[in-house]
Amino acid sequence: MEAQRQDGKLASSLSLGKYHISEEYGFLLPNPLEELPDHYKPWMEIAHRLPHLIESHQLQAHVYEMPLLDCRFLTSYREQRLAHLVLAAITMGFVWQEGEAQPQKVLPRTLAIPFVEVSRSLGLPPILVHSDLVLTNWTKRNPEGPLEIGNLETIISFPGGESLQGFILVTVLVEKAAVPGIKALVLGVEAIRQHSQDTLLEALQQLRLSIQDITRALAQMHDYVDPEIFYLVIRIFLSGWKDNPVMPVGLVYEGVSTEPLKYSGGSAAQSSVLHAFDEFLGIQHCKESVDFLHRMRDYMPPSHKAFLEDLHSAPSLRDYILDSGPGGCLMAYNQCVEALGELRSYHINMVARYIISAASKARSRMLTRLSPHALEDRGTGGTAVLSFLKSVREKTMEAILCPGA
């Protein structure tokens, strides 16, 4: 009786709106704000000029002249999300303006205090995260037009030109491609609760197609992002101050803490999409990978993290399929796992091109003094990137079910 009550509670709670998940845009923030109230004009003036201010080595001087602004005029959730993006972007530019050789160790109080305040209100860390760079950082050129790269632009940018735009906007398209898959998870949980194999089969087929669409969307990265520009110019502005050899003690947030604080940089692992797919499919990763992936959930909007936790608590898809015996659902499940493994293989190849190969080319061209070489074998989130991704792919493929298992 208790199990039935719990299942019913979980099924009813997996309505996307409860978790700030859009039926149309998934984890993307629908139609993000592009401007803050006039009170925050000093922030916006700097944020809109970030590429120029960083490249001309003027950003730090402008930050030191910023007034300390009160956050109480940020009255809506969407305003807070834009404020977090703006302050995070200014922070990354401030810390890394002079490259990895001269990172700033202290964030001035006029930036640190409001950034930490907004972060606490949102339940996010005071550093640039995936929900800033991607989920909140897109707008349509033509509001009535399609969500495709030719009709998209970023709200806040960094040095890197078209490659930086491409990196962010292709990732927006990846998040959009995941929307049918996210809906399939909710449908699948309900199907298990209702013991409806036909509905579950439909959900699994929808999930597989979505995963394949994600892989196709990710492939556009090669069309829009130059590996050398990503490695030499863009990557440093996604790097954090945890598990980073060039900032071993972290960053002091002046007016907030006298001790340095450590936060990981941006990482694909901060996207909720593959976490959600793993939870639904019952993929079991090794402890080291799990520790990192779960730490990355603290870099997600709390409502998205709650969705993942509720998926974890939902009835087990693998157990249901094994109990049901060989059939269409088992085959469809395995096809989902295979598609997820193929996506992860594609991601590995992309990381090899954009980080490993780009680092090697930089060394061969005697450009290493310009490149973030201390980070060259690590993701911006602080992981040893290839070994982590290969482990995650291996554990994904181990989830394949054998008939009669």
From Swiss-Prot:
Q: Which cysteines are joined by disulfide bonds?
A: none
Question: Which top-level enzyme class is recorded in the Swiss-Prot or TrEMBL entry?
Answer: oxidoreductase
Q: Which Pfam families match?
A: IDO (PF01231)
Its annotated pathway reads: Amino-acid degradation; L-tryptophan degradation via kynurenine pathway; L-kynurenine from L-tryptophan: step 1/2
Q: List UniProt keywords, sorted A-Z.
A: Dioxygenase, Heme, Immunity, Iron, Metal-binding, Oxidoreductase, Tryptophan catabolism
GO terms (BP aspect):
'de novo' NAD biosynthetic process from L-tryptophan; immune system process; L-tryptophan catabolic process to kynurenine
Q: Does the keyword Heme feature in the UniProt annotation?
A: yes
Name any GO cellular component annotation. Answer: cytoplasm
Q: At which positions is heme bound?
A: 347
An example molecular function term from Gene Ontology annotations: tryptophan 2,3-dioxygenase activity
Q: What is its EC number?
A: 1.13.11.-
Summary of activators and inhibitors of this protein: Activity is inhibited by D-1MT (1-methyl-D-tryptophan) and MTH-trp (methylthiohydantoin-DL-tryptophan) but not L-1MT (1-methyl-L-tryptophan).
For this protein, what reaction is catalysed? L-tryptophan + O2 = N-formyl-L-kynurenine
UniProt lists the family membership as follows: Belongs to the indoleamine 2,3-dioxygenase family.
Protein task? Catalyzes the first and rate-limiting step in the kynurenine pathway of tryptophan catabolism. Involved in immune regulation.
* Additional facts recorded: Ido1 and Ido2 are 2 distinct enzymes which catalyze the same reaction. Ido2 affinity for tryptophan is much lower than that of Ido1. Ido2 may play a role as a negative regulator of Ido1 by competing for heme-binding with Ido1. Low efficiency Ido2 enzymes have been conserved throughout vertebrate evolution, whereas higher efficiency Ido1 enzymes are dispensable in many lower vertebrate lineages. Ido1 may have arisen by gene duplication of a more ancient proto-IDO gene before the divergence of marsupial and eutherian (placental) mammals.
- What name does this protein carry? Indoleamine 2,3-dioxygenase 2
> From which organism does this entry originate?
Rattus norvegicus (Rat)
